[in-house]
Amino acid sequence: MYLKERKEVKKMWRLKIGEGRGDNNPYLRSTNNFVGRQTWEFDPNAGTPEERAEVEEARQNFYRNRFRIRPGSDLIWRMQFLREKKFIQKIPPLKVQDGEEITYEVATAALKRAVHYLSALQSKDGHWPADNSGPLFYHPPFVMCLYITGYLSILFSAEHRKEMLRYIYYHQNEDGGWGLYVGGHSTMFCTAFNYVCMRLLGEGPDGGENNACEKSRKWILDHGGLTAIPSWGKTWLSILGVYDWSGCNPMPPEFWSFPSFLPIHPAKMLNYCRLTYMPMSYLYGKRFVGPITPLILQLREELYTQTYNEINWSKTRHLCAKEDLYYPHTLIQKLLWDSLYYTTEPLLTCWPFKKLRGNSLQVTMHHIHYEDEASQYITIGCVEKPLFMLACWIEDPNGDCFKKHLARIHDYLWLGEDGMRIHSFGSQTWDCVFAIQSLLASNLINEIGAILMKGHEFIKNSQVSNNPPGDFRKMFRHISKGGWTFSDQDHGWKVSDCTAEGLYCCLYMSTMSPEVVGEKMEPERLYDAVNILLSMQSKNGGVSAWEPAGAQSWLEMLNPVEFLSDLIIEYEYPECTASAIKALSLFQKLCPEHRKNEIEKFLSKAVKFLEDSQFPDGSWYGHWGICFIYGTWYALKGLAVAGKTYSDCLAMRKGADFLLKTQAHDGGWGESHLSCPNKKYIPLEGNRSNLVQTSWAMMGLIHSGQMERDPTPLHRAAKLLINSQLENGDFPQQELTASFMVNCMIQFAMYRSTFPLWALAEYRSKVPFPSSKF
């Protein structure tokens, strides 16, 4: 039995912060001395018997409850940090019984318990580490890439592989498949990917815990076999040699040489889409296939409903299992691909057009090298990383570029009680700015000054200090100097909301004593951040995420990804817009003369965008969280900061009414992830509540001035938070609460610790006490 085997483990993993400092590895480099870098290390000598037993108990608890609470609770590093800091929760918990009132003292006790717990989780660099995974297609490409290049057992030790298999087993659905994300319904894409991953990691065709391989293979064959896998799966399995390139729609590398006046041009694409298809087109243009090993031949036999050599590959190009299909390809798309497949591609493989293909591959590789250098070989994200790395290996298996990629693989690994996975690339800055704001809201400054100072230093150290190298606009890039990334400075890709929240924290702490929070940020660096935000506003007043929006909306019809949406071009987002309003409003108060007219115009247009993007029911669609509750919290915050009130703003009244109408019987809020793909509000099954979403709704109502009209809904929500708090001061892990590209959900493990604290802090400082009895 898998769990019994794990009881014999006598060694432990450790989370290391800032690894690489003083390292003589010539292939590992950093722009700011690896501040915020997170890597896991297996220590064969670590751990007392009690510590190992605690880890094992966490694993078994997750396994027993894996179909009830789907995401892990991210406990391994928390246990480590709490042990290292000798954390003991000294404040006893207080519960609010039915018929009792909530007093200021009860709210304060709950708040202090949460603050002390969160403070203990801060890293030595000043940020809060956390899992940022969830999609179940993140890890297999790394395994495939390292298998192809011969580095699988070199980069991933036996302990790494054991924990990766644990993650796969623990997140297998009861029907034998794997969802697009943790807890999602089974899909061909992720079931095939995880089956192949298990086999590459050493499992036999009938191996795996609880017959994992046999069950998943049956699911695949029962649903049509690998020919029904979506396009990204077709691409990766062609690279691996388990599928055939002639069963893929064309991805011509000539695209990267298109003139800029064309409506279809790389500079007009969303950066993530652009940098996914860039290396894919290189691999497609070369029709690269990895070594055909006996294992690859076995996989060809195991995963199709007909003999591999008898498959008519050209007819499989447009196939996609119904379980995976969210964004069906249009007839125009199919005609375009067919014309490329039957006319253009045959020409480009023949002389003299073959020379054009060769030149295009060189141009594509030039762009790949540029992006690698600009990101210290982290690349933009985990979907792109193995593609970029493989392209470098194909160009030169012994080259420095490939070795620099290898040195950054461990930045993507994350370990929890549910095993080891690939996560995005880290959410260090994002989690830090929210943790800092929640702590600031607590008004317990005298107790947590050292925590605030370290967090402030991390935020300042993580600001991007330069634009992308060279002629970055020619490389389809936008300015980045003064921005903040989602993770750390090395990553290099600034994001508007990360920039706005980072700027807000620095501005707020510039008003506090330097003896408490450290020296304020230099004015020029603040101005650089403001410049980033001003550059990101569109004509409609909205703010985009990574690069200025403006491409024609019809380009989205060319979306080739069957299971995601809104990923071809940049859009404006209510969340990014509201964050920018918050930061620039505070900047305007503190630096009233700097670009005064531009900022006033920006704020006016941004407020108009929020008002115009409201749904008829009063909600706002959240693009990065689940979903309407998340978007509504942001929008109400932005409107309130801009000076709008419930009495003079219809949008604010409608937003508050939406939240009041969706409050659950227990006083909380709970929204299903199905709201995201369906684009309409859907409550959690059984109308149960989620504490993170409850916190967002509470803060949204507070921004609307609900406490002045009727504080009862806020008291009811606070009662739920207070009574749900754990013994150590944390809050329990529940459903995933974040999303991206409309149809995929993702885990932000720090949300459960940050947002309930923040909501209680706002509640304690702004809602009158005592509450009525209820």
Swiss-Prot record:
Name the UniProt record assigns to this protein: Lupeol synthase OSC3
Keywords per UniProt: Isomerase, Repeat
Pfam families per UniProt: SQHop_cyclase_C, SQHop_cyclase_N
Keyword Methyltransferase among UniProt keywords: no
Active site residues according to the UniProt entry: 497
The protein's role, per its UniProt record: Oxidosqualene cyclase catalyzing the conversion of 2,3-oxidosqualene (2,3-epoxysqualene) to lupeol, a pentacyclic triterpenoid with anti-inflammatory properties.
One cellular component (GO) term of this entry: lipid droplet
Enzyme superclass (EC): isomerase
Any one biological process term the GO annotation gives: triterpenoid biosynthetic process
Pathway: Secondary metabolite biosynthesis; terpenoid biosynthesis
EC number: 5.4.99.41
UniProt tissue specificity: Mainly expressed in bark and young petioles and, to a lower extent, in stems and young leaves.
One MF annotation (Gene Ontology) recorded for this entry: beta-amyrin synthase activity
Superkingdom of origin organism: Eukaryota
Coiled coil: none
High-level lineage: Eukaryota, Viridiplantae, Streptophyta, Embryophyta, Tracheophyta
PFTB repeats: 111-156, 161-202, 209-252, 466-514, 526-568, 603-643, 652-693, 714-755
InterPro entries membership: SQ_cyclase_C, SQ_cyclase_N, Squalene_cyclase, Terpene_synthase_CS, Terpenoid_cyclase/PrenylTrfase
Family classification: Belongs to the terpene cyclase/mutase family.
Catalytic activity: (S)-2,3-epoxysqualene = lupeol
